């Protein structure tokens, strides 16, 4: 078994909506990013790549490459997952923690789980997404941006 950890953060800037976990969430602010700014899928992709020793999302999809400008993070996740599977890994489970003062994530979490399970070709029982605040502390607490952490467990298919 292999464990990977991912982290991502994006600052608010411009107009909303925002995309988190593949879900378009109405909000007055947008997130500044080269791609669609989906902190949840970026952290998850990093966790999966880390568990497979394939580097990170920036190595695979560099923000210096114009091809990834405005990229759909669900497509990036699916491509990373294809590469991970090609190395002989299967999914154990993933756990995602979104850190944001606002907007409220709870109403959107069920759809995030659906999208992640679809993209990874797994059962929803293998996908957990939760959200928390920092009780108005730090940059997320001041409403300056959103952060996310993710953990992934992989298994070698032949073991």
Curated annotation (Swiss-Prot):
Catalytic activity, reaction form: 4-CDP-2-C-methyl-D-erythritol 2-phosphate = 2-C-methyl-D-erythritol 2,4-cyclic diphosphate + CMP
InterPro entries reported in the protein's UniProt record: MECDP_synthase (IPR003526), MECDP_synthase_CS (IPR020555), MECDP_synthase_sf (IPR036571)
Role description: Involved in the biosynthesis of isopentenyl diphosphate (IPP) and dimethylallyl diphosphate (DMAPP), two major building blocks of isoprenoid compounds. Catalyzes the conversion of 4-diphosphocytidyl-2-C-methyl-D-erythritol 2-phosphate (CDP-ME2P) to 2-C-methyl-D-erythritol 2,4-cyclodiphosphate (ME-CPP) with a corresponding release of cytidine 5-monophosphate (CMP).
Species per Swiss-Prot/TrEMBL record: Klebsiella pneumoniae subsp. pneumoniae (strain ATCC 700721 / MGH 78578)
One Gene Ontology MF term: 2-C-methyl-D-erythritol 2,4-cyclodiphosphate synthase activity
Note accompanying the cofactor annotation: Binds 1 divalent metal cation per subunit.
Cofactor: a divalent metal cation
Alphabetically ordered keywords of this record: Isoprene biosynthesis, Lyase, Metal-binding
SUPFAM superfamilies from the UniProt entry: IpsF-like
Site description Transition state stabilizer, residues in chain: 34, 133
UniProt superkingdom: Bacteria
GO biological process terms held by the UniProt record: isopentenyl diphosphate biosynthetic process, methylerythritol 4-phosphate pathway; terpenoid biosynthetic process
Keyword ATP-binding: no
Enzyme Commission number: 4.6.1.12
Name of the molecule in the record: 2-C-methyl-D-erythritol 2,4-cyclodiphosphate synthase
Keyword Ligase in record: no
Lineage, top ranks: Bacteria, Pseudomonadati, Pseudomonadota, Gammaproteobacteria, Enterobacterales
Binding site for 4-CDP-2-C-methyl-D-erythritol 2-phosphate: 8-10, 34-35, 56-58, 61-65, 100-106, 132-135, 139, 142
Pathway: Isoprenoid biosynthesis; isopentenyl diphosphate biosynthesis via DXP pathway; isopentenyl diphosphate from 1-deoxy-D-xylulose 5-phosphate: step 4/6
Annotated a divalent metal cation binding sites: 8, 10, 42
Assembly and oligomerization: Homotrimer.
Family, similarity comment: Belongs to the IspF family.
Top-level class of the enzyme under EC nomenclature: lyase
Gene it is expressed from: ispF
